[in-house]
Amino acid sequence: MIPRTLAAGTLTLAAAGLLASAPRAQDVRRGAALFAETCAACHGADAKGDNGPNLTALWAAGATDDRVTQTIRGGIPGSVMPPSAATDEEIRAIVAYLRTLAAPPPAAGETARATPERPQRVVLVTASGEDIRGERRNEDAFSIQIEDDGGRLRGFLKKDLRDIVRGDAGRGVPARDRAGADPGIGYRDLLDGLKDPSRWLTFSGDYTGRRHSPLTHITRENVGRLAAEWTFQTGTVTRGRGFEATPLALDGVLYVTGSNDFAWALDARTGRPFWQYRRELPTDLTYGAMAPVNRGFGLLGDRLFMTTLDAHLLAFDRRTGRTSWDVTLADYRVGYSATVAPLVVDGKVIVGISGGEYPTRGFLDAYDPASGARIWRFYTVPAPGEPGSETWPAPEAAARGGGGTWMTGTYDPELNLLYWGTGNPNPDYYGDDRKGDNLYTNPLVAIDARTGVPKWHYQFTPHDTHDWDSNHVAVLADVTIGGAPRPSTGSGRTEPVEVRKVVMVANRNGFFYVFDRRDGTLLVGRPFTDTTWAREIGRDGRPIVLNDGTKSCVPDQWGGTNFNPPSFDPALSLFFVNARETCATFVPQAPKIAPGRQNFGGVVRVDREKAYGALRALDPATGERRWEFRYPSPSMAGVMTTASGLVFAGDNEGNVMAFDARTGANLWRYATGNPIWGAAPMTYLLDGRQHVVIASGATLLSFALPDRAGS
């Protein structure tokens, strides 16, 4: 049977010669008939999408004939699309037909939204009479985007301008030669985090990972008037995933990455692009084709930093979108990829790696932001003789032991410690050839930012056989702990009340943890979802395991939560997370291991009958639930809070919502039309108005109160 759901896909079949020549007319006719019979029910009669994604946009989004062919051949793990039993000729015919429906892809670096083909000098005359000279980057009937002669990207609404004078060819000088040029972002700016509410400079907004904004323009009283301000359609598609990036905001510009290694600089007022970047990717991607996502930029000076699906780290000039340097992290052909949003700390760009479903060895790297030279590397699976190597049975198991680092961590500048989670051991579900705890897979690791040496670690799921990566945002805060029995021990012993410097993690295994971030002391360890695999955390800090998953286990392989970011409101001292209530049976199988080949080591049978999702507020002092708001299905959306007492979240049904952080009462919702997968809201102040932005499907949406209503 030919599968019914298709999205941009994976490995090349060029060697098989399936698509070596131009499509023949008879192939197109046969492909149209096969598509109507087996694919149209999900993808629509015109292939523009129904329950399944739009297939006419695949090539414009960077897919190739080879990738689409392999997606049909192999299916999409974890989705309703199984591997296909179709013949090579049938697959070739379907791809040939789809190719006739596809628009041509944009050229590399080309902006897809009416960017002027030739540069044009302009003088913008503001309402106050100020002349702003620069080069036009984009324009529509209502707005214009320029790079001014100081090198700043600036967007204007035409209603706010007195005049636009065009063709000012001789009156400008190169931006870098002018006084008052954009000074860029320094380390001090990153340390300040969200003190300037017009900015959002890191993946989580600041180094703490709280995703908590000081803005109060949108309140419990007026959030019901929140309305869509603009949308930006990326035109990219993923394999049943979503648009997972968090934009960075600086001086009225949003910098955002997308699927298939696209990236844009957008006018934060209108969503119109100043520039677009598109990476030319190899056709034989491994993990990068399975999950062609990207989670965002890092920022320092006038440079942006981005990882790529073929496991590179790039530096861009943020004014132009042109690359400054390009370094290789690892060999993508083995199974490596990179999707993490880099974290820039003092003199270093910190990046992780993906590929734990392949025979890879995870690591975390630090690079010089000026040159791209590597400063240090921490391997998440130790070499023979190193601390932790005793938890692996043989060097060959450790050499392919997994432990990816694909979610952005957090940073305490006072302690100079990075807090980073790592992923599952490899193979995911089959553990017979890797007896032991398998360090450092599935822990939180506190790493010296200067040297890359781990200071302490805590392993959430020793010897994991459930694919419960610990790639979560670890949230830093100062929390009052004590005065009640410690939930991690259940001993009834009362602890003294004190304010502790903590790091908090809602883990994929269904437990919520609070540690002293200075030394890793476990303060709280308590389930925040139903769990059948473990009863509690024992006195030794290890889970008391009840069920290995082969007899139905809670949670499933996607976990009690996943990489979708949580949030923390320091005024309320509440931790907010989208929880998943799920169940599955894990069936381990010995895999065939080879470079570039996925090896999950089994299958998972998910019971969806009773599954649901919930936004939950947790007390970090005890781990107790304060309130919840339920969704009909598990959500993979992230969370954001604001100082006005609001929680913003999303769900799998495509709703972006606002809640009263104190009670969980729903105050506002907007139906985006696509599941919100992995993305979390962010917010910024512009022209005296607070904007809330979130990615949904392949679209970025911005919301604000009507003009002056929130000022």
Give the predicted meaning of each segment.
Residues 463-465, 470-473, 529-535, 541, ...:
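Conserved blade-ending motifs and adjacent loop-strand segments that build the rim/top face
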Residues 581, 607-665:
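Loop/turn-rich, solvent-exposed surfaces of beta-rich toroidal or solenoidal domains
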Residues 267, 317, 368, 448, ...:
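Structural recognition of the beta-propeller blade-terminating site
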Residues 181-238, 272-281, 285-286, 322-331, ...:
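Aromatic (tryptophan-biased) beta-strands that constitute blades/sheets of beta-rich domains
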Residues 200-204, 240-262, 287-313, 337-358, ...:
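Repeat-blade elements of multi-bladed beta-propeller folds
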Residues 41, 46-51, 55-176, 200, ...:
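Extracytoplasmic electron-transfer domains, predominantly the class I c-type cytochrome c fold
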Residues 363-373, 437-451, 519, 613-619:
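Beta-propeller blade signature
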